[in-house]
């Protein structure tokens, strides 16, 4: 079986996670782009410095950066064929809809009837249950649980080990704190923390 070839933008922690995803599928990482010279040639992968469109144009590009706003900005500015990557030990039901650039890592679960927007990260051991709608440029952090029927707006961060209970709607650009339990819907552009989750910051 022919290997899929990739290049990454980003040479920080999330790049290492995504390198592991490629290895699980026996795919090939050709190069990493990052403007910070201190991060070049991490884990033996050749760094090309800042992104250049003419380097490995045949490869699929993944924005291996955890920050939602940065992923969105780069996706609008880069002219390259984007790829998605799913770890061999993730579970993604066949009746799901995945956008371009999706990153689903070790132990993650995406259940039947759910949709995951473009350039969204479903991180280690996170669960998206049935019939959820997860927007673009979302990050569901390690261990988070999204129960059935939840809707999550673009650019939202669901913190590590947070839980969103069934049928809640989470707005755009929301930050859900680590370990929070969301029991009701949350509007756009807020920070919510605690058990049960309460809004502590707007904007």
Predicted regions and their residues:
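Short, Lys/Arg-enriched, disordered terminal segments
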Residues: 1-5, 57, 201-203
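Generic structural signal for conserved hydrophobic packing positions in ordered secondary structure
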Residues: 10, 61, 82, 129-130
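Structural signal for interior beta-strand "rungs" in well-ordered beta-sheet cores
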Residues: 85-193, 197-200
């Amino acid at each position: 079986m022919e290997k899929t070839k990739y290049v990454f933008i980003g040479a920080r922690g999330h790049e290492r996670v995504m390198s592991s995803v490629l290895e699980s599928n026996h795919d090939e990482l050709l190069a990493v782009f990052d403007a910070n010279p201190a991060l070049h040639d991490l884990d033996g992968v050749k760094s090309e410095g800042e992104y250049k469109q003419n380097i490995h144009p045949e490869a699929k590009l993944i924005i291996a950066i955890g920050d939602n706003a940065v992923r969105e900005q780069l996706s609008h500015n880069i002219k390259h064929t984007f790829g998605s990557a799913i770890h061999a030990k993730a579970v993604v039901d066949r009746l799901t809809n995945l956008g371009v650039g999706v990153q689903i890592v070790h132990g993650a679960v995406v259940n039947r009837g759910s949709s995951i927007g473009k350039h969204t990260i479903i991180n280690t051991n996170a669960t998206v249950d049935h019939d959820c709608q997860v927007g673009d440029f979302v990050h569901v952090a390690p261990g988070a649980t999204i129960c059935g029927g939840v809707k999550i707006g673009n650019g939202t961060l669901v913190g590590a080990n947070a839980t969103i209970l069934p049928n809640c709607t989470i707005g755009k650009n929301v930050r859900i704190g680590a370990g929070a339990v969301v029991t009701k819907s949350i509007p756009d552009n807020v920070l919510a923390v605690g058990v049960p989750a309460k809004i502590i910051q707007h904007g």
